């Protein structure tokens, strides 16, 4: 029987340093080494979320990490989720259920923080009773000392869990010595003792050139450098931060099926398109440029955290007109979740669930009307699209109800295994669905691409589940080969 290990927390010198991906790697490594790990992030801020088997909502990163660990995802892995709806306001999701909208000042003030702290601590305790080790992830930088008293996710959480903290730094952005040294020196005396190691992430070039730098950093901070993880390009792990959109392709190319994802201001769940991005038959790109939309064979309208605001912006910047023009010219248009709502005749928000806009006309491509509601639908679903016999999987996360225009007969796109219906189907080039993950199903992808068969240069079909498992193993091998795992296990065994 394996000896129990201390929890480990991957804390960061800043945002987007690679904490989530390294956490996924460690989850897979511990699984490979015979442990039963589970991920934990007390508070996550993201628009990419996922539905648990119980029909509750967590951050997508923790769902990915759970998949890497080989365990079902659960709200205890991410008890507090913030979903931004504007620059200043977020929907607060506690233990998988929305409890209201808060602006930043309301959320970070001290009143009510202890109740939230008790909730995230209780979630950790439940998780730690079922799994070992717990692979914890901090949020952003651990150096925001002005937020220390109300912090729920970084060093106070590590202290509660009695976790060994590993500081992750991104050398690719420069200033790694200052960021590591500053992050350590800004901690309290007790918190400094909790930081047991440093991981230098995203290194480019010959690692031997940094050997002297490792010694300098260890001498400066008094903390061992556990590893230098090289930058990689050939490993593909789903990421939830919107910053990754900055690195995605933005233009059409010749010789493949061009699929344009409309780049909404409040785009959510862009992981819906990861499977298509790996399909060699197509070229998928993100754009809100009307000229690039005109070059697409298929236009996908993605999910949105603020559908009415995005609809208003699409009309203002000409994208709405470009989509309608493309549709008239024979381009396929499909909407997912908020994108499905955008394609309807009207969107109503009588109670101001999303904000101040109460009603707008939709794109008018589907004979449906959406009414925003405070009750959120969150569930995993099995379904069959149209007359297809293959069972597909996906999940729903939305706060609107979409119904047919009165007096109009609508063909549902999907029939759910529980007897329900989803979406609207006009023809093979015009449809919408509430189901996230619909584009992870090979049968549906083949149906979507079918009208463009003459453009296909490659007929290789990707088994996405097998592909993801291979990527987790590749990531684990990459991190394992550049990390001092014996020292990490020694630290987590309490022998540091």
Protein language model regions, located:
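A conserved active-site-flanking secondary-structure segment within enzyme catalytic domains
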Residues: 344-394, 399-402
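Catalytic nucleophile serine of serine hydrolases
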Residues: 337
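Flexible phosphate-sensing "switch/lid" loops adjacent to ATP/NTP-binding sites
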Residues: 1-325, 332, 374-375, 384-496
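Short active-site segment of divalent metal-dependent hydrolases/proteases
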Residues: 340-341, 439
């Amino acid at each position: 029987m394996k000896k129990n290990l201390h929890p480990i927390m991957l804390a960061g010198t800043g945002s987007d340093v690679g904490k989530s991906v390294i956490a996924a790697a460690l989850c897979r490594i511990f699984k490979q080494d015979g442990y039963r790990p589970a991920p934990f992030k007390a508070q996550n801020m993201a628009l990419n979320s996922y539905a648990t088997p119980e029909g509750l909502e967590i951050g997508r990163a923790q769902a990915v990490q759970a998949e890497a660990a080989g365990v079902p995802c659960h709200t205890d892995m991410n008890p507090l989720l913030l979903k931004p709806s504007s620059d200043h306001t977020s929907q607060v999701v506690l233990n998988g259920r929305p409890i209201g909208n808060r602006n930043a000042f309301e959320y970070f003030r001290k009143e009510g923080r202890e109740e939230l702290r008790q909730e995230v601590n209780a979630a950790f305790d439940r998780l730690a009773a079922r799994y070992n080790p717990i692979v914890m992830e901090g949020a952003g930088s651990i150096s925001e000392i002005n937020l220390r008293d109300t912090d729920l996710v970084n060093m106070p959480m590590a202290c509660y869990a009695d976790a060994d903290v590993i500081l992750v730094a991104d050398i690719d952005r420069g200033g790694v010595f200052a960021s590591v040294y500053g992050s350590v020196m800004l901690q309290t005396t007790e918190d400094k003792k909790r930081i047991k190691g440093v991981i230098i992430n995203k290194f480019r070039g010959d690692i031997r050139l940094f050997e002297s730098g490792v010694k300098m950093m260890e001498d400066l901070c008094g903390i061992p450098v556990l590893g230098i993880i090289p930058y990689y390009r050939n490993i593909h792990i789903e990421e939830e931060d919107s910053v990754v959109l900055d690195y995605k392709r933005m233009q059409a190319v010749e010789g493949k099926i061009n699929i344009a994802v409309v780049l909404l201001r409040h785009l959510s769940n862009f992981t819906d398109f990861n499977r298509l991005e790996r399909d060699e038959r197509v070229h998928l790109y993100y754009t809100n440029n009307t000229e690039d939309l005109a070059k697409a064979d298929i236009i996908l309208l993605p999910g949105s955290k603020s559908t009415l605001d995005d609809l208003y912006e699409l009309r203002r910047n000409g994208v709405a007109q470009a989509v309608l023009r493309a549709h008239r010219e024979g381009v396929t248009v499909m909407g997912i979740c908020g994108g499905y709502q955008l394609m309807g005749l009207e969107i109503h928000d009588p109670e101001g669930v999303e904000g101040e806009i109460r009603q707008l006309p939709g794109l008018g491509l589907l004979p449906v009307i959406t009414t925003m509601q405070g009750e959120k639908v969150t569930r995993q679903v099995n379904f069959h699209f149209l007359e297809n016999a293959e069972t597909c999987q996906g999940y729903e996360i939305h706060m609107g109800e979409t119904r047919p225009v009165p007096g109009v007969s609508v063909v549902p796109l999907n029939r759910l295994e529980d007897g329900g219906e989803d979406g609207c189907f006009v023809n093979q080039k015009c449809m919408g669905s509430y189901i996230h993950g619909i584009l992870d199903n090979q049968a549906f992808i083949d149906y979507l691409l079918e009208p463009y068969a003459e453009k296909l240069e490659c007929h290789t079909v990707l088994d996405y589940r097998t592909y993801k498992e291979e990527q987790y193993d590749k990531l684990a091998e990459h991190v394992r080969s550049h990390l001092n795992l014996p020292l990490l296990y020694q630290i987590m065994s309490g022998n540091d």
